[in-house]
Amino acid sequence: MEAMGEWSNNLGGMYTYATEEADFMNQLLASYDHPGTGSSSGAAASGDHQGLYWNLGSHHNHLSLVSEAGSFCFSQESSSYSAGNSGYYTVVPPTVEENQNETMDFGMEDVTINTNSYLVGEETSECDVEKYSSGKTLMPLETVVENHDDEESLLQSEISVTTTKSLTGSKKRSRATSTDKNKRARVNKRAQKNVEMSGDNNEGEEEEGETKLKKRKNGAMMSRQNSSTTFCTEEESNCADQDGGGEDSSSKEDDPSKALNLNGKTRASRGAATDPQSLYARKRRERINERLRILQNLVPNGTKVDISTMLEEAVHYVKFLQLQIKLLSSDDLWMYAPIAFNGMDIGLSSPR
């Protein structure tokens, strides 16, 4: 390998003209066999030396010489190369190890080159690297680094976005929890206020109902007291009416306890009256109530609706009893007593 490297350096540095290189290569390669044919051959050269192609092959080295307008390719059509400047250039590919029982075939499938251009001679020439047979695509190092940087920046941006979202979500949750607590406190306060208002309303309604009941009871008692009459003689009734009228007028004018009784308050709360008028009126009311009880039990099958009807029925009943007593006490008319008892008028007027 060292010998071939020296030859390549000598060829690249010493022989600059096409004719001298052709003569030298004819003499040099006369003793070597072509790797594909097994015989020693030179090269195919044109008259103007534009199609010159030299191939120096062995088990370990590979040397190629290309003319000004020519081009060459590596084995198995792995890559292509084009030269655009003047002069001849030599290219020495990398060394490939080979087994003893196999022939040397240089393949670019297993070699990966990340560069797109080679600096040869005075000027630069570009080598367009195509896809290899293995399906891999070569990319320049700068683009790979840029892509890697772009991916890292994208990852960092995503991480920052997720962190900001999580922070905003936590803030929103905390705000939502605080607002929920405030709402619950307000609802509880409103419920308590409503309960208190309903309790107050219920108490007020109960008090109003009690006062209404008391007023009704007092009104009924007053109506009974006003409608009560006495079953005394006309003189006693007139006296009682006069006394009652005078008492009522005097009590309305002088005694304010009656007004309090109309409002539902009892007189016992203010103490018992000791004046003679109030004592007389109390005795009179008690006597009237006793006579009303006797009247209710006296008339059979009475209506007991109001005191006026009760009095009328009592009067008719008393007249009926007087007639029956008259008929039964006479010797001539006793037979008419049952007829008069059944309600038939026989023309006998009851005595007055």
From Swiss-Prot:
Main location: nucleus
Annotated Gene Ontology cellular component terms: nucleus
GO molecular function terms noted in the UniProt entry: DNA binding; DNA-binding transcription factor activity; protein dimerization activity
Outcome of gene disruption: Reduced length of root hairs.
Region of interest: Basic motif: 272-285
InterPro entries assigned: bHLH_dom, HLH_DNA-bd_sf, IND-like
Cross-referenced PANTHER family: TRANSCRIPTION FACTOR BHLH83-RELATED, TRANSCRIPTION FACTOR RSL2
Protein name: Transcription factor RSL2
